[in-house]
Amino acid sequence: MKKSFSILSIFTLLIFSNLTINSCGSREDTVSCFPNAPINVILNLNLPAYYSLNQVGGWKYIDEQSSGTRGLIVVRASSTTFKIYDRNAPHICPDTNTTLEVKDDISVVCPKDNAKWILLTGQPTAVANVPPKTYLSNYDANSNVLNIYY
């Protein structure tokens, strides 16, 4: 009786340990071959080049130094918040035609497989089941400067 109780206890412990380890793992937001590059961009939104980012819903491609391997898509989500997307498709490995593009000012599209996301939220709407990779930013409303980093 003690032996079967001991075996049952060990078996139960192993099952719960396995469930705990697997359920607490981090969710992958991109495919494993997604390029990892440092991001450090400062945008002065007072400059004419960034005029489109002064209105909610406005967006701009950023292809400056330290803006990733294919650049960024910066979207003004509200008067004080921005969405910063990597232009690499998050659901497939980098290849020809996997650079994300904005279409009709409302969606982000991957030309390779026509995966789509909502521009303002990053929510997937077709093909992909993960949002575009996003980056952190700080916005100083007094100086109208946006700092993007990773």
What is each model feature region?
Residues 1-11:
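Bacterial N-terminal signal peptides that target proteins for export
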Residues 1, 24-25:
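A generic structural motif
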Residues 24, 89, 110-113:
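Short cysteine clusters
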Residues 27-105, 118-119, 133-150:
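N-terminal pre-ligand scaffold of iron-sulfur
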Residues 18-23:
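C-terminal motif of bacterial Sec signal peptides marking the signal peptidase cleavage site
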Residues 103-113, 124-137:
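Short cysteine/histidine-rich metal-coordination sites, predominantly Zn2+-binding motifs
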Residues 13-16:
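Non-catalytic accessory regions used for complex assembly or targeting
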